[in-house]
Curated annotation (Swiss-Prot):
Misc note: Suppresses the CDC25-5 mutation in yeast (restores cAMP level) and has similar functions as CDC25.
Coiled-coil region list: none
Composition skew (Basic and acidic residues), residue ranges: 1214-1236
Ranges annotated as biased composition (Basic residues): 1239-1252
GO biological process entries: cell division; Ras protein signal transduction
Domain Ras-GEF span(s) in chain numbering: 952-1199
Keywords: Cell cycle, Cell division, Guanine-nucleotide releasing factor, SH3 domain
Origin species: Saccharomyces cerevisiae (strain YJM789)
GO molecular function ontology, one term from the record: guanyl-nucleotide exchange factor activity
Listed name of the protein: Guanine nucleotide exchange factor SDC25
Record lineage: Eukaryota, Fungi, Dikarya, Ascomycota, Saccharomycotina
Superkingdom per UniProt: Eukaryota
Intrachain S-S bonds: none
């Protein structure tokens, strides 16, 4: 059966743009006739070899229903005849399934990529080619599969119907059915049937293809689809400008199109796509681009504008000039070549393309000239360059070096020896040979001359007053020269005629001299030690997983998070200031150079006419013709615009400017101004930025002190240790000199230390068999104390038969666990008990050795063991291996030998190990008095403002002192050691109950005071509470209760209280001055020097010290000093291989512990009020933390505009104030006002004059 195309009822009607119906077949399969089949039946199709049949249905009887399209031989208008009928499928073969088949390449990712079918919508107009153009484009292109063409009838304007053949893969129409010869060997399932895969698979992609290597923009080209779409967009844009008769826009679009084609060429070279199909297609693409570029220029130059306008406006293509038709035909071929290139690359649709546009490497953007220490942690500290870590790894991989982790990637300076003797980070020999071929040997940053200031300076500048003084001193030296330069500029402005050129050169020379003098300031800014802020960021990370030995609770995490948010904007401003410092210096140099030029605009032609980012790719949302001006016109108009200059124009320059305009001269929008004004303004900016640098260094120093001050006042020594970890000079302690201590406070007085020199001299006179064997392995300090020694030497000195060093013995027994395990320590003592006699002794010498050394040493061993078990034993010292020592048997042997104290030793051993009594000799007492009723009396609480104000400040301070001193007395030396050692030496220490309770009480008191104030809605009552607590703190000071006093001060300077402007206004100045004096006493400057002086003057008075200072001293002494000493021989200049115990570190710990114990001995003679004490204890429970209190503070006084500072000289005010004290808008505007005038090439725009 047959029918005309217009009456084909089995097709789905589709209308074109002009409303004409286009019958479109929807076959379920396409088959090719392989054998001839003739039939006379009208419901069956006769087939010839090569016919394409479009299958509509597949019958169950073995016959298929299909459509065969042929030209009508009897009709002059070449109408189409559609034959539909049944045909036998055995005479055909399906080609649709082969087209969509997926080759088995053994890789799941490649299978997914090969089966991906993205439909490109590259052009709004269809691409229609003649057979000649199609064959010309596809000549020498090997298609591994035959292309499937769908015949599509299309109505023409004259009412005729034209048949076009459409290929969906190439998205192209052809006027004649193309036929391309197929290869003889079928390679559908062969790996090489996909040229892109065959060339790339198995090879390493270029290093620029790594998705984690660069900071990418949203508009960057990443995939093949994006690239093809972007290029086609510029083709469409160029074609539209051609038809619009806009020559300037056409040239701009053509320039952008040429840049994108260049990117395509570079991309194919980077991917090493050397397949002939790619090379030939790309060559044809470039040739076609050159062809229509030449023809288009001929079109614009040879044809008048009006004629071009008339020709381009013709809707009938036949009425256009042949040249224009040829150009448009070339555009059609260009579109098809792009589709063909995309079709050949289609199997790699998800492959990430190499980065072609310049982008910053990740972890490397440190502004222009400055290092960013917040990114340096990712770099190897031993590297001689600051190359990005990802870049180093990528280049190493491209050089044949495989590193499983970043630590295996070495980097050494050019020409530096890599032998194992000089560096323990040297690579292996095979790696050295490979590395010679990498790019690192030619990296400029790897040379000694181009190293940064950071790499040249070994130690950073600490954040302290000394560093600030260096900056200020350098600035004062620069100010004198700068003022003279400003004076010269003013003289030029007042007397331009007599201003010589020589003076210009002199000012230029002084500018360079001034800038060179700025290097020390740049050195300080570049090398400030920001370790504490780096640690704060790490600790404030919510995703951070802490080690087991790091104890950080929820309250500590809340404090860290709050501190990080409060300090982040200060650090951001600091780095902005560094960048503006760079901008001002650069501008200062440029302006000074202008002074020596006859024509200050002589370098203007060197400026690029194109704006920044002119050739940047466009965003996907902009790739349509409606938004085409975003790239072509918008970028040129908006990006080139610069702000007006704020300098006053020179009158003579204005006259010249207007004359040039009147003469129609090209002035290129240049601004004529007086250079002296510019130079003077640059000097002013330079002067201001120097002051600004001092201000920011001072702010960083204050914020560091405030952060440590708050952590110390809250007794968060673990936080302090983590914040200062890695900081230069952290915890340093000069072991050579012992801190001066009051004789009254010295608990363990050693009256014999002054005679140590004479005693050591007497040892030399003894016979050799009576001398100490390990005396040469002891290191003595200048204070006649043991500074260090080997384990054998320390044990020998501990059990010495002639010398009893009481302080050494106590220090050893308290801190022995940091040197030995319990089993090891007792084993050494047992070995010392069973001393072997020296060799070659006669009978008399042996008897003398037994009498004068062996027996006294045995007595000393038994005495030391007894003292250890009786006074210094701690349940955490127990170990499973202790049973192997048979201590009870050892004691019984000592009893049989009649050793003094052996009976008591056996008693202590049995008590500690056999009877299971593992209680500590100094067991802690209960927190409260035993007579206090254990039943909680909840009726009386300080829960209201009236109840708190009703209590007399003296009574409250007295009972608070009694309560806190009782808790302080429960602190043991083992609590302190547990706090600083944690699990460092043993995991059986557990918690520190006494110390934890004392710290918890102080922090609860702080929260109670601050919460009592913020929950009160009435301003006058809040002011009374402030005054009331200040008076309580003052009485606590009079009672030497520094712990409670510090807790109250910390509460009043907390973020939720400090910001209450209206409340502080209601407090009288005398009371605020009283608070200021209390805060000055606890000033953390110089390691709490004011508080330490006050504490030292107390002598025998009762006191509750502020424990935060002790915790800091213990933490810094333990963490900041090594456990071992390494001696260096002066003659050889090499280190001794033996390790000596740093006993001086242990002595310093005991010095601090003895001061803690001292204040437990003197008690207060106050009368205890049980009701008040119980009310205080119960009121401290269930108090909200800092965040909840701050929310209440915002409710009672929202958004204060300015702050009334209760203590203007307090150093902890900026840490305690909240991050919301300054609104975000305020911060932003402040930063803009401060730094806007330092922007290079841009100044503030003057307000335009509005004419009425």
């Amino acid at each position: 059966m047959s029918c005309t195309a217009s009456y084909a009822g089995m097709t789905t009607p589709v209308k074109d743009k002009e409303g004409h119906g286009i019958p479109c077949l929807q076959p379920i399969d396409v088959v090719e006739c392989t054998y001839q089949y003739f039939t006379k039946s009208r419901n069956k199709l006769s087939l010839r070899v090569g016919d394409l049949i479009y299958v509509l249905t597949k019958g169950s009887n073995g016959w298929w229903d299909g459509v065969l399209i042929r030209h009508s031989a009897n009709n002059n208008n070449n109408s189409l005849i559609l034959d539909r009928g049944w045909f036998p499928p055995s005479f055909t073969r399906s080609i649709l399934n082969e087209l969509h088949g997926v080759p088995d390449i053994g890789n799941e990712l490649e299978i997914f990529q090969a089966g991906l079918n993205l439909k490109l919508e590259l052009s709004s107009n269809p691409v229609i080619l003649s057979l000649e153009d199609f064959l010309d484009c596809c000549r020498d292109i090997e298609f591994k599969e035959q292309l499937a063409w769908s015949p599509t009838p299309v109505h023409e304007r004259k009412g005729c119907c034209e048949l076009l053949y459409y290929n969906q893969d190439l998205d192209v129409y052809c006027r004649t059915l193309p036929y391309l010869p197929q290869n003889q060997v079928e390679t559908v399932n062969d790996y090489s049937s996909f040229p892109a895969i065959s060339k790339i698979a198995g090879k390493k992609m270029p290093i620029t293809s790594s998705p984690d290597l660069f900071y990418l923009n949203d508009c960057d080209v990443v995939y093949w689809y994006d690239l093809t779409r972007l290029v086609c967009h510029y083709v469409n844009l160029t074609e539209r400008d051609l038809l619009a008769n806009e020559r300037e826009k056409f040239l701009t679009s053509l320039d952008l199109l040429t840049a994108q084609i260049t990117c395509v060429y570079m991309l194919f070279r980077n991917l090493r796509l050397v397949e002939d199909s790619f090379k030939k297609t790309l060559k044809k693409l470039i040739y076609t681009l050159s062809r229509f570029s030449i023809n288009a220029n001929i079109w614009f130059h040879s044809t008048p504008f009006e004629e071009r306008e008339a020709i381009a406006s013709q809707k009938d293509p036949e009425r256009r000039s042949p040249l224009l038709q040829s150009i448009l035909g070339t555009f059609q071929k260009f579109h098809f070549l792009l589709r063909l290139l995309h079709f050949l690359s289609n199997p790699n649709e998800l492959t990430i393309l190499p980065q072609l546009t310049p982008r910053f490497f990740k972890d490397s953007f440190n502004t222009i000239s400055w290092n960013n220490p917040f990114l340096r942690k990712h770099l190897n500290q031993h590297m001689s360059h600051d190359l990005p870590r990802q870049m180093i790894k990528a280049v190493a991989g491209a050089s044949g070096i495989v590193a499983e982790n970043n630590d295996e990637i070495p980097a050494s300076k050019q020409g530096t020896s890599c032998s194992s003797e000089t560096s323990h980070h040297s690579p292996s020999a095979p790696f050295q040979r490979r590395r010679r071929g990498t790019i690192f040997s030619n990296v400029p940053g790897s040379s000694d001359e181009s190293d940064t200031i950071w790499s040249k300076r070994k130690k950073p500048y600490p954040l302290n007053e000394e560093t600030l003084s260096l900056v200020r001193a350098r600035k004062e030296q620069l100010d004198a020269k700068l003022k003279q330069m400003i004076k010269s500029a003013n003289e030029y402005l007042s007397n331009t005629a007599n201003f010589s050129k020589m003076l210009n050169f002199e000012m230029n020379f002084k500018t360079y001299e001034e800038v060179s003098g700025t290097i020390p300031i740049i050195d300080i800014l570049e090398n400030l030690d920001l370790t504490i802020y780096l640690n704060l960021r790490e600790l404030g990370d919510e995703n951070r997983v802490f080690d087991e030995d790091v104890a950080i609770d929820d309250e500590d995490k809340e404090f860290l998070k709050h501190s990080l948010s409060s300090l982040s904007y200060i650090l951001s401003d600091y780095f902005n200031m560094k960048q503006y410092f760079h901008d001002v210096v650069v501008k200062f140099i440029i302006v000074a150079q202008h002074l020596t030029l006859e024509d200050p605009f002589v370098f203007s032609p060197m400026q690029n006419d194109l704006p920044t980012g002119y050739y940047e790719p466009m965003k996907p949302s902009s790739l349509n013709l409606d938004n085409a001006k975003d790239k072509k016109n918008g970028s040129q108009n908006t990006d080139i615009q610069e702000e007006e200059d704020e300098y006053e124009p020179d009158p003579d320059s204005l006259i010249l400017f207007h004359n040039l305009i009147n003469q129609d001269s090209d002035f290129n929008d240049l601004k004529f101004f007086n250079l002296a004004h510019v130079f003077k303004k640059s000097c002013d900016d330079y002067f201001d930025v120097l002051k600004l640098s001092i201000e920011f260094v001072n702010r960083l120093i204050l914020e560091r002190e405030n952060l440590l001050n708050y952590a110390a006042r809250m007794m968060k020594n673990n936080i302090t240790e983590l914040l200062l970890r890695g900081e230069e000079g952290y915890g340093s302690y000069d072991g050579g000199e012992t801190a001066e201590k009051s004789d009254t406070n010295a608990v363990y007085a050693d009256s014999d230390t002054k005679d140590n020199d004479e005693w050591r001299d007497s040892q030399v006179k003894l016979p050799r068999y009576l001398q100490r064997e390990y005396d040469s392995e002891l290191i003595w300090g200048s204070n006649n104390r043991i500074k260090g020694g080997s384990k054998h030497a320390l044990i020998s000195y501990l059990t010495d038969n002639e010398k009893k060093d009481l302080f050494f013995n106590i220090t050893f027994l308290i801190t022995f666990r940091s040197i030995f395990t319990t089993t090891e320590f007792l084993s050494y003592l047992i070995s010392q008990y069973n001393l072997d006699p020296p060799e070659d002794l006669c009978f008399e010498e042996y008897n003398e050795w037994v009498t004068k050394k062996l027996i006294p040493v045995k007595c000393r061993v038994v005495e030391i063991m007894t003292t250890f078990f009786k006074q210094y034993w701690f349940p955490g010292y127990d170990e499973p291996d202790l049973a192997t020592l048979n201590l009870d048997y050892f004691a019984q042997v000592a009893i049989k030998e009649n050793i003094t104290g052996s009976v008591e030793l056996l008693k202590e051993v049995n008590q500690k190990f056999k009877h299971g009594n593992m209680q500590e000799a100094t067991a802690p007492m209960k927190t409260l008095d035993q007579q206090i009723c254990q039943e909680h009396y909840w009726g009386t609480l300080y829960s209201t403002t009236e109840s708190i104000l009703a209590v007399d400040p003296v009574l409250f301070a007295t009972q608070l002192t009694i309560l806190e001193h009782e808790i302080y007395c429960e602190i043991t030396i083992f609590d302190c050691l547990q706090k600083i050692w944690k699990n460092k030496y043993t995991k059986s220490y557990g918690a520190s109950p006494g110390l934890n309770e004392f710290i918890s009480f102080a922090n609860k008191l702080t929260n109670f005071i601050s919460y009592s104030i913020v929950k009160e809605a009435d301003k006058s009552k809040r002011a009374k509470l402030l005054s009331h607590f200040i008076f309580i703190a003052e009485y606590c000071r009079k009672f030497n209760n520094f712990s409670s006093m510090t807790a109250i001060i910390s509460a009043l300077y907390s973020s939720s209280i400090y910001r209450l402007e209206k409340t502080w206004q209601a407090v009288i100045p005398q009371t605020r001055d009283l608070l200021q004096s209390l805060d000055k006493l606890m000033d953390p400057k110089k390691n709490f020097i004011n508080y330490r002086s006050e504490l030292k003057s107390l002598h025998s008075a009762p006191c509750v010290p502020f424990f935060g200072v002790y915790l800091s001293d213990l933490t810094f002494t333990d963490s900041g000093n090594p456990d071992y000493l390494v001696l260096e021989h002066g003659l050889k200049g090499v280190h001794d291989e033996k390790k000596y115990i740093n006993f001086n570190k242990r002595s310093r710990l005991v010095d601090i512990l003895q001061e803690i114990i001292y204040f437990k001995k003197t008690h207060y003679d106050f009368t205890k009020d049980r009701t008040v004490i119980e009310c205080i204890s119960n009121s401290l429970e269930n108090i909200p933390h800092i965040e909840k209190q701050y929310q209440l503070s915002l409710i009672i006084e929202p958004k204060p505009r300015k702050k009334v500072v209760p203590n203007s000289n307090s150093n902890n005010k900026s840490q305690e104030k909240s991050r919301d004290d300054q609104t975000d808008e305020g911060k932003t505007s402040t930063k803009k006002d401060r730094f806007s005038k330092f922007q290079l090439h841009k100044t503030k725009k003057k307000a335009p004059k509005v004419s009425k």
